Amino acid sequence: MEAIKQIRPQAEMRYREELDALAAADAENRRPLGWKLSPRAVRDFILGRSKPLEYQGRQVTITKKYLGNDALVERCIITLTGSRGLMLVGDPGTAKTMLSELLSAAISGVSTNTVQGTAGTTEDMIKYSWNYALLLAQGPSRQALVPSPLYTGMERGILTRFEEITRT
């Protein structure tokens, strides 16, 4: 049987070595509760560094991944340090999804916790829903609950990305 090929791996997999090198170099720096990297290291991950980092006996270059406005990235990071929501608004093709994926990978270590908005997105897709067979058999229980990405984000303390929120 042929293995399934991924079109594009998640940011945390694609840039694993860079994230690991930044985490090792960043170990002494302060970071907001639940963050994998300090705000400075998150900035370096997205906007790149001029000097490579020494990691496991090798030089690791932190590449620039976002080719837009550096000040925008810094404002996004500052907003997220305050435990506030961040909404990126712009024309199609302006790297909003890419930036949110990079921020999630650097801050939470997970970029796939996403609610995909559509015209058919319902409240239970955002909060949680129930496995009705288990609900009838056991009553309301944790096993019968089907967590949404938002529920998972709140439970694990990771970022939740909403894609195409205007289409809901």
Per-segment meaning from a language model:
Residues 2-168:
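AAA+ P-loop NTPase catalytic core and its hallmark functional loops
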